[in-house]
Amino acid sequence: MKTLTTFAQRLIFPALVFCGFCIALPPFFKSISIMLLALILLASGELFRCKYTAKQIFDLRNPLFWLATLYILYCIGMLWSSNTAYGMMDLQIKLPLILIPFLFCFIPREYLTKKRLWIYASAFITGITIVLSYLLISGIVRGMQAETFNFRSIMYCDLSKKYAPNYLATETCIAAILTFFNPLKFLRISNKGIIIIKSCLICFFNTLLILLDSRVGSIGIAVADLIILFHLFRKRNILLAFLFLAYVIGNVAFVGAMSRLPFEREIGQPIDGKHESRLVNYYNVITKVIVKSPILGYGSGDTKDVLTKMHSDEQIGFKRYLNAHNQFLQTTVAIGVLGLACLVAVFVCFALRLWKRKYFALLAGLAIIGLLMMTESSLERQAGVHFCSFAFCWLYAISCKNKKKERIEQV
C-alpha cells in the first residue's frame, strides 16, 4: 500500500502537465485528464488532506469560492425547473466549475510553485500548437484538392469545423501572452534559442488568429501584441520590436488581401453590417425576458425552452443556436441576478488580485476571457467550461503569495 501511495505521489506532477496539455484537445482527452488527476490524488492519499483552511476557502475575496458558488446556484436552480432532463445535462457540462477547484484544494503546494506553474502553461501552449497545426494542415490539404487553391479552406469555420472559432481564438490569444512571458528555464537552452522559439510560436499564433477571423480573437490578439510590443520597447529590444510590428502588419495585409470574398459564419449568413445591429436587438429582447423573472431566473433546466420561445415570438434569427450569446445574460436568465453577481464576483476578485500583484499581462488575459463571455455563452459548452476552470485555478495559484516571494519574470 505504501509503495502504491509513493508511486501515485510521483505521478501528480505528470498528471498536472497532462491536464494542461489536454485543455485545447477534444472533449475525450479533457475528461480523461480530470479523471486521471482525481484517481492519482485519491491513490496518493492527498485527497484526504486539504491544503487550505476553511477561512481561506470561504474567504469572500477568493474568486474560486464564487466560481464554486455559481455551480451550487445552478444546482439549486433545478428546484424550479420543469425540464429536468436538460437541466441535468447542463449541470454535467458545468461540473468542472466545482470539480477542478475542488481537486485544486488537495494538490500539494510543492506542485504549485511558479516554476511548475509555467511548465503547466508550457503544456497548454504545446497542446494548442498541435491543434492549430493539425487544423492548418487539414485546411491546406482541402484547399489543394480543388483545381486552384481555395483560400477559404483555411479561413474561419472551414479551418475549424470541429472547434468553435471564438473559443479556439481565445485560447490562442492566452497562449500568445503566456508564450511571451514564459521563462522556459526548464528547456535549459541559450537565451537566443528561447527567443527563436518564442518568436516562432507568437508569429504562428498571430497568423492563425487572423485566419480564424474571430471578433474575439481579433481584439484579443491586438491586446496581446500591444503588450508584447510595450515590453519589447520597455526592455529596449528596439530591433526585435520593429521586426515583430512589421510582421504583424504584413500578415494582416496579406491575409486580408487573400480573403476579400465574403464567407458564411456560424449563423448561416454572409458577413454584413447588419450582424451587429441584429445582435444588439437580440440582447435587448433578452433583457426584457430577464426583467420578468430577475431574482431567481427561469431555472437551470428551462433556459433553452425560454430562449426557444423568445426566438419564435420575436423571429430574431440565430435559429440554430438557442443561447444568449453572452454568458452574463445566459446566467441571469437561468438563475437570476444572484448567479450574475457570483459570475461578476469571480472577475472582480481576480482583477483585484492581479492588479495588487502588478501582473498586468495576466490581467489582460483575464479581460480576454471576459470578452469571450460577453460574446459567447462559454459556460454552456465543455470547451469553455474546461478552459475557464483551469485558467481560473492557474491564475489563483500564480497570484498567491509564498514565503520565498517567487515572482513571475517580466510580468
Language-model segments: what does each one mean?
Residues 42-50, 221-242:
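Perimembrane helix-loop-helix junctions
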Residues 133, 211-212, 232-271, 284-292, ...:
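A membrane-periplasm/extracellular boundary helix in multi-pass inner-membrane enzymes
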Residues 36-42, 177, 181, 362-374, ...:
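Transmembrane alpha-helices of multi-pass inner-membrane enzymes
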Residues 19, 116-150, 162-233, 353, ...:
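Alpha-helical transmembrane segments of multi-pass inner-membrane proteins
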Residues 334-370:
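Hydrophobic transmembrane alpha-helices and their immediate junctions
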Residues 21, 43-52, 78-132, 371:
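Transmembrane alpha-helical segments and their membrane-water interfaces
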Residues 270-280, 284, 292, 296-335:
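Long extracytoplasmic/lumenal interhelical loops at the membrane interface
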Residues 1-49, 71-81, 369-371:
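N-terminal signal-anchor transmembrane segment
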